[in-house]
Amino acid sequence: MSYELTISFANALVDPPEDITAEIEDEAEEHMLFIVGDVVGPAAAADTPLISHRYEDLESDYGANATGEDLPVGLVNRIEALAPGEGSLRVILRHLPPINDVPQKSGELPSDLASGRELPGSVDVDLTFALLVS
């Protein structure tokens, strides 16, 4: 089975909570989501994956792609069930603003994360969810 995974973000530290997804969309060239855990996909290579992941959006979906490649953002994804079981699904949002006009965001970042390399930028969100595939 294949599913669309759409991710949105809210700042619950303010009252009322504020949807900040539009800010990520506006700064698409400076943000990238990574899906890891018991997953196989661009940013993960689990030995016994329960699901596969692929990006379904690009920076140009949210506005003009002004710098470099038209890279995934990760707000829209395709998830496919591979095997039944229990595990974890981790969602990491990184902020990757340019440094001295040089982009930090690149197409190699998902594979860098999968191979254990340190990523540039800062972590905006890092959440782990229980994953059950039946």
Question: Residue locations for each model-derived region?
Answer:
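Solvent-exposed loop and beta-edge segments used for protein-protein assembly and interaction
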Residues: 1, 25-27, 83-85, 121-123
